[in-house]
Amino acid sequence: MSAVENNEIQSSGLTDLEVRILDFESNWWRFAGAKESAIKELFDLTAPRYYQLLNDLIDREDAMAAAPMLVKRLRRLREARMQARSAR
């Protein structure tokens, strides 16, 4: 995420943790295990707790206003996972 985008997010009314989560999610991970290790190291959260916070965050309008493309992508991914689960 660029410095300009990060400054826009910080001025959006989100908490520092929420800004860090959005910034973290803007990265791409090749392996799921690497991402989960980074979650523990950077946020001192378990992966399930991190994803609970993320799911709550991407439903909020201030997150959408701060990082619309990222939030839309995360919402699409979540919806696809939910549809795949319900199709089983």
Residues of each region from the PLM?
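Short, Lys/Arg-enriched anionic-surface-contact patches
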Residues: 6-19
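Short acidic/polar alpha-helix capping motifs at helix-coil junctions
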Residues: 1-4, 76-78
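Amphipathic, hydrophobic secondary-structure cores in small proteins
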Residues: 20-78, 82
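Long, charge-rich, low-complexity intrinsically disordered regions
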Residues: 2-9, 86-88
